[in-house]
Amino acid sequence: MSSVTKRPRAKRIRLPLEIIDTILQYLDPILHAKVVGLTTRVKCRLLRDNNVEDYLKLTPASYHPTTDQFICNYLGITNQPMAPYLVPLLSFGKASCVFFNKCIPEDVRIVTLNWPLPLLENFLSKQFLWYKLARKLIEHERRMDRCVTPSTVQINLYDDNEDYLNCFNCFNCCKDNLVSFNCCIVDCNINDMNRCPDLQIDVYLDDNIISLYLYFLFRIYRIVKE
């Protein structure tokens, strides 16, 4: 009876987590996170892709927004007044505008709405349409010598049937129809408007109500009633 020669078992090589993490960066960031967890590399990938929603979803059960310093460090705003409130604001999603108005101190709101650092403004504008539009309108008002320094903002959005769309606070909602938010705002007298807008937006900067008319893919008209 012939003897069978057994081959020696190959030794299993366990790669360090850092090397695995480096290899996995070529995968989808969500899959990357599910394999190795929310590592620093994964966090940076998600934030580079402006994917805050999945960043928050992938955090462990023990996670609390008020203790997360990573996003502020990533943006370089750790010394800014908004820093302690940024991640809680992001975690509120559709209710972010309400949280901003009611839970953030007035002096912080004023700075964030009127004189934000460019990095912070760019980041918040990508997360929240209400913030993007508020900043665009505030800058327009100043260019037109209408001084505004609001501490609160509320936005009511209507379609051509005057139906209120209450999902405006979420960046992803309605974004396909609001491409024109990237164009400039121009003044227009209400008497010069010859047709109904495709979209009407009432912006409350404190108690000051400003109406905007949108005609898709063209421009935003700031209605002047003088």
Swiss-Prot record:
Swiss-Prot/TrEMBL GO biological process terms: proteasome-mediated ubiquitin-dependent protein catabolic process
Pathway involvement of the protein, from the record = Protein degradation; proteasomal ubiquitin-dependent pathway
On the tree of life, the source organism's domain of life is Viruses
- Work out whether the entry's keyword set contains Transmembrane helix: no
Q: Which UniProt keywords are listed? A: Host nucleus, Transcription, Transcription regulation, Ubl conjugation pathway
| F-box domain location | 9-58
**Location of this chain's protein in the cell:** Host nucleus
Instruction: Report the GO terms under cellular component.
Output: host cell nucleus
Name the predominant localization: host cell
Q: What does this protein do?
A: F-box protein that manipulates the host DNA damage response (DRR) in order to promote viral multiplication. Acts as a substrate recognition component of SKP1/Cullin/F-box (SCF) complexes for targeted protein polyubiquitination.
Q: How does it assemble?
A: Interacts with host S-phase kinase-associated protein 1/SKP1.
Q: What is this protein called?
A: Late expression factor 7
> What organism does the UniProt record list as the source?
Autographa californica nuclear polyhedrosis virus
